[in-house]
Every structure is written in structure tokens, then in C-alpha cells.
Amino acid sequence: SSEIIEARQVADRPKQKGCGWTNAVRISEAGGAKFSAGPLSCQAAAAFALWVQYEVQPAAERIFGQRVRSIQNFGTYSCRNIIGSRFWKNRRSEHATANAIDVAKFRLADGTQISVLRDWNGKGKKAEFLRAVNKGGCRFFRVTLGPDFNRAHRDHFHFDRGQLWSCR
């Protein structure tokens, strides 16, 4: 489709104990890639769609000569604190307000799968692609974390639109 994003609105879940959301959507497609995820804040959904359209697809075409068909994620909403950091452990994660997404795998048009866990430390095209799209997340998200940040992120990219700023 020519749309950058296909999504439907999700009913608000009023915040309780720092968890919940307003103005969230469920994305079914972004930048031409199929996608299935839980509720995501409108600003995070917009950032995600722009990232797929202007970073993921161009990188896939440049490196593999084809587009990404689908993107797998580990989730959007989760009522919890930040994981993997002693300093931030008492702060609510952006996942607690559906303002973050964890991306784990990409599938190309020919069925080739690219996994953050398996391919990040490789030497070939898959690693090149993952490093390009991880860095590209910094254009659209306030926080971009990947396997080089800490062990908690060894198998996914964390992207969010919260108050903090970090490109790792």
C-alpha cells in the first residue's frame, strides 16, 4: 500500500500506578512491512512508521536488494519499571505507558530472517543491516538501545519517545 502506516485506534486505559495509556493505536503495517503489536502511543507509532519507511526499507534495499516484508517485536505495553539498570530501576519504563517498542527480527521479501540476537555480532550483511537500522532509530526516537547497551538488550532494539535521550 502507499500508506506509511496502517493502524487502528485502541480504547484508552486510564493510568493507574504509573501504567496505562491514552491516544494509542495498534499497527498492522508500517512502511510496507507487516507488523503485529500491542497498543502503542500515537507519537511512538508515528516514529516507528517513519523509521521503517525512511531507515529500514532503504537499508534493506541497499544491502539486500529487496524490502522487509515483516517485523517481529517483543512487545509495546508492559506495566513495569526499567530493566537492566541499577540507576533507573525505580523509574517506570516507557513500556508502562505504551510509549516504547522492542524490535527483535526482520523478514525480507524472499523469506530471509534477520535476528538481533543471532546476527548483531556477525560479520556479514545481516549485521551491517542491523547496525544501520539501530543507528537510524535515533532519527525518530528519543531513546534507541541495542545489544551494545547492556545484556538486557542483547536480543532486541528498544525504541521509545519518553523524556530521556540516548542513542546506544
Spans of features found by a protein language model:
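Active-site acidic/histidine clusters and adjacent loop/turn architecture
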Residues: 1-72
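Catalytic cores and adjacent binding grooves of peptidoglycan-active enzymes
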Residues: 16, 57-58, 89-168
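Active-site-adjacent substructure of cysteine-protease-like catalytic cores
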Residues: 62-98
